[in-house]
């Protein structure tokens, strides 16, 4: 009898652990974060929380990224106050929102500005990082065990409180550990504890992860320039974070991520936050912090497509068949282009989520595109799409050609069409973008704004003659040669035509609901499917083949 009870208890524990793991994995694999991150000071009072979260619901978000401030959580050492955090959970639950807490602990944007006053004042117990010139910084040293233990204690208390307040993860779905970790002014910390660590051999675990066989000191293995110093610092930041991540796993298992400020504009380590969870340091971070699920980019610079491609890391055999890094964008500039960028990230890279920063402070003109895109994405996800592409165009990057098993789709910015005066009035083109979904053979969905697509067979595309169109949609000028007649008279093969282009919605069951047919002038007499700049639509496109 006793033996049976013991076995039953062990099975219950096992199932609970498996359930926790599955729930954590399901957030990563199934839920799509249509998010927004609050500005840094938006959650410092109960009244602010009660005002801002309902506004986020109205904007169409399903998830809000909310700071949790160490200085408020533990303003008196050893005494935790969860008043702000509890109200955040309560209001989010009322609004039907998910929350991703941002642990503003030892570091926020490299600095230790959110550490409590008792921590800041006790420099002897909680030492600072030091530049190569010997200047102390307002950056707690990750080489100090006192710093780690103080941070870990508060973070663990937060995780324990989440486990008690939201045990089924109905509201809290993921956790960000610290914020934009990195060393500034120097590529690495030069404090006495850091110098001692620098003289030690490179850990075998890191050498193995990087495929380096020859052991040695950090200088011997990597050299002595700023980028070598950055590797040293990245390993130690990652190991620090791993302590917090392991605690989170033990207390209340959920997806965990760290975010990175980009190494942009030709800056060197220390000019940008050195050693953060950047793409070129991903192997070091994955080795030092294996409990972290995602390295996430904060994107404010130009070149959105290039940045996201670096963090949407593909399957590799050495990763045991696991995705090396699922794309999640916790911060992006909130602007009129945010909506099409979200569609691109989800369509091209099957992103976990997208989140414009300081969305609570953005103007209606800046948030409108987010609301429109999230409305389309919510409908698309109801249909559980499998085969998708992302489109994103601007004035320079105007066209993309996709060959989908013989269906050649030429996708362009809407302003490549000649009849919209905004295309040629000299103003900067807004970005156009969309998510393109294959439902089946000759069957597609297009969701977005500011794009146009035509569909051809491969042979059709090969023999296509480029002609500049006039504002009436016909050739701008006549041809004096018979070249056009020669090509068409010798055409041999099938062509694709538009069977129908319907504007639709998708309901909660994933079923399409017809709104209107796009034909005639709206499809250029069957030549293309298009969504104009400023419009946000979901089009169901069906093709047919003819000879």
Regions found by a protein language model. Give the residues of each.
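Catalytic-core region of carbohydrate-active enzymes that cleave or remodel glycosidic bonds
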Residues: 97, 243-253, 279-387
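Aromatic- and carboxylate-lined catalytic core of secreted/periplasmic carbohydrate-active enzymes
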Residues: 339-462, 473
């Amino acid at each position: 009898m006793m033996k049976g009870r013991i076995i039953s208890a062990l099975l219950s524990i096992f199932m609970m652990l498996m359930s926790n793991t599955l729930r954590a994995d399901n957030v990563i694999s199934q839920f799509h974060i249509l998010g927004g991150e609050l500005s840094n000071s938006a959650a410092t009072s109960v009244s602010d929380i009660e005002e801002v979260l309902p506004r986020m619901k109205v904007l169409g978000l399903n998830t809000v990224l909310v700071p949790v401030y160490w200085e408020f959580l533990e303003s008196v050492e050893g005494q935790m106050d969860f008043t702000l955090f509890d109200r955040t959970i309560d209001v989010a639950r009322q609004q039907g929102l998910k929350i991703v807490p941002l642990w503003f602990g030892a570091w926020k944007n490299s600095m230790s500005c959110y550490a409590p006053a008792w921590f800041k004042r006790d420099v002897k117990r909680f030492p600072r990082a030091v530049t190569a010139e010997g200047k102390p910084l307002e950056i707690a040293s990750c080489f100090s065990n006192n710093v780690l233990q103080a941070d870990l204690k508060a973070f663990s208390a937060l995780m324990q409180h989440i486990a008690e307040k939201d045990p089924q993860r109905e509201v809290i779905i993921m956790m960000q550990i610290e914020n934009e970790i990195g060393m500034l002014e120097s590529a690495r910390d030069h404090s006495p504890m850091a110098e001692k660590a620098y003289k030690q051999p490179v850990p075998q675990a890191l050498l193995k992860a990087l495929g380096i066989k020859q052991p040695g000191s950090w200088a011997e293995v990597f050299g002595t320039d700023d980028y070598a110093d950055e590797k040293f610092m990245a390993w130690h930041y990652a190991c620090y974070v791993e302590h917090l991540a392991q605690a989170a796993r033990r207390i209340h298992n959920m997806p965990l991520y760290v975010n990175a400020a980009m190494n942009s504009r030709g800056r060197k380590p220390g000019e940008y936050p050195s050693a953060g969870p950047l793409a070129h340091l991903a192997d070091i971070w994955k080795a030092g912090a294996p409990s972290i699920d995602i390295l996430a980019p904060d994107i404010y610079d130009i070149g959105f497509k290039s940045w996201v491609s670096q963090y949407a890391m593909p399957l590799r055999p050495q990763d045991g068949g696991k995705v090396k890094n699922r794309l999640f964008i916790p911060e992006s500039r909130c602007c009129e282009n945010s909506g099409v960028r979200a569609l691109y990230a989800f369509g091209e890279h099957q992103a976990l989520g997208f989140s414009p920063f300081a969305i609570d402070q953005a103007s209606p003109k800046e948030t409108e595109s987010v609301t429109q895109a999230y409305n389309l994405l919510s409908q698309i996800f109801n249909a559980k799409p499998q085969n998708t592409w992302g489109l994103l165009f601007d004035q320079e990057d105007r066209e993309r050609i996709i060959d989908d098993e013989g269906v050649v789709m030429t996708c362009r910015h809407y302003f490549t069409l000649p009849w919209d005066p905004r295309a040629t009035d000299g103003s900067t083109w807004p970005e156009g973008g969309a998510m393109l979904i294959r439902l089946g053979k000759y069957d597609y969905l297009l969701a977005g704004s500011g794009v146009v697509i035509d569909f051809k067979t491969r042979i059709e595309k090969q023999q296509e003659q480029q002609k500049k169109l006039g504002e009436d949609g016909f050739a701008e000028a006549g041809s004096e040669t018979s070249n056009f007649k020669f090509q068409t008279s010798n055409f041999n093969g099938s062509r694709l035509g538009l069977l129908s282009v319907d504007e639709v919605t998708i309901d909660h069951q994933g079923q399409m609901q017809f709104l209107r047919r796009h034909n005639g002038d709206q499809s250029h007499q069957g030549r293309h499917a298009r969504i104009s700049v400023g419009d946000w639509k979901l089009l169901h496109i069906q093709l047919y083949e003819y000879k």
